[in-house]
Amino acid sequence: MVKKSKGRQKIEMVKMKNESNLQVTFSKRRSGLFKKASELCTLCGAEVAIVVFSPGRKVFSFGHPNVDSVIDRFINNNPLPPHQHNNMQLRETRRNSIVQDLNNHLTQVLSQLETEKKKYDELKKIREKTKALGNWWEDPVEELALSQLEGFKGNLENLKKVVTVEASRFFQANVPNFYVGSSSNNAAFGIDDGSHINPDMDLFSQRRMMDINAFNYNQNQIHPNHALPPFGNNAYGINEGFVPEYNVNFRPEYNPNQNQIQNQNQVQIQIQNQSFKRENISEYEHHHGYPPQSRSDYY
């Protein structure tokens, strides 16, 4: 197999003729040189001073503990007094600890950066695979133009309609119809009698609404829990018919005149009974109620 590129080759150590390449190489090599000097100071505790002039006559320097102290010691070559030497050692120890912490932090940050780069490459590969499969809804919208965004919106609306239809079919197949009569519960899922779909309705709120309506109790509906009394007049001459059910929770308030009212009612009932007896009308006979009773003397 023929190689398409020359690969990594040894660079010839001559001055570069291209100015742009020269500036780029100087910047990269200078950073690498200062990094190596910092590692040498950290690992070995050495004192280093580096002064570099760029091709544009700019000065760059690096020194540990600092450039001035290292240069002064190199020029004068005089040993420091004992007390100054001790102070210098304390300062150097403190600086070394700070530099060590910074180097450790830099190492951690660089390792995290490499990890994030690997994750980015993996996600990029996954995105390319999904894009090839046709998962257009996972494309980043930040990279789309206005016309592409309008088309993306239309595709999402069509997808919403399809999902609404499938969800309504699923609910109709799995949820029984609790509504009485000819009405259909398709409207609860966004579909009316004409099979028109309303994709703007929330399926989850519709499901909750359906569950509530399906088991809704109508308090106005009459449930005859016991047999009704017969039509006609009772022993007191009162016409009987449908009566409301007894309410267990009903508690009448106390009325101090209740006994007096009951006595008056009893007196009225006695007067009515006496009037019936004077007219020779049976207290169990019904004349004006429904249904009429058959009598032989009518014929």
From Swiss-Prot:
<dbReference type="GO" id="GO:0046983">
    <property type="term" value="F:protein dimerization activity"/>
</dbReference>
<keyword id="KW-0175">Coiled coil</keyword>
<dbReference type="GO" id="GO:0009960">
    <property type="term" value="P:endosperm development"/>
</dbReference>
<keyword id="KW-0804">Transcription</keyword>
<keyword id="KW-0539">Nucleus</keyword>
<feature type="coiled-coil region">
    <location>
        <begin position="99"/>
        <end position="133"/>
    </location>
</feature>
<keyword id="KW-0238">DNA-binding</keyword>
<dbReference type="Pfam" id="PF00319">
    <property type="entry name" value="SRF-TF"/>
</dbReference>
<comment type="function">
    <text>Probable transcription factor. Required for suppression of cellularization and promotion of nuclear proliferation during early endosperm development. The FERTILIZATION-INDEPENDENT SEED (FIS) polycomb complex is required for suppression of ALG62 expression at the end of the syncytial phase of endosperm development.</text>
</comment>
<dbReference type="GO" id="GO:2000012">
    <property type="term" value="P:regulation of auxin polar transport"/>
</dbReference>
<comment type="subunit">
    <text>Interacts with AGL36, PHE1/AGL37, PHE2/AGL38, AGL80, AGL86, AGL90, AGL92 and AGL97.</text>
</comment>
<dbReference type="GO" id="GO:0005634">
    <property type="term" value="C:nucleus"/>
</dbReference>
<feature type="domain" description="MADS-box">
    <location>
        <begin position="6"/>
        <end position="66"/>
    </location>
</feature>
<protein>
    <recommendedName>
        <fullName>Agamous-like MADS-box protein AGL62</fullName>
    </recommendedName>
</protein>
<dbReference type="GO" id="GO:0000977">
    <property type="term" value="F:RNA polymerase II transcription regulatory region sequence-specific DNA binding"/>
</dbReference>
<dbReference type="InterPro" id="IPR033896">
    <property type="entry name" value="MEF2-like_N"/>
</dbReference>
<keyword id="KW-0805">Transcription regulation</keyword>
<dbReference type="GO" id="GO:0003700">
    <property type="term" value="F:DNA-binding transcription factor activity"/>
</dbReference>
<dbReference type="InterPro" id="IPR002100">
    <property type="entry name" value="TF_MADSbox"/>
</dbReference>
<dbReference type="GO" id="GO:0045944">
    <property type="term" value="P:positive regulation of transcription by RNA polymerase II"/>
</dbReference>
<dbReference type="InterPro" id="IPR036879">
    <property type="entry name" value="TF_MADSbox_sf"/>
</dbReference>
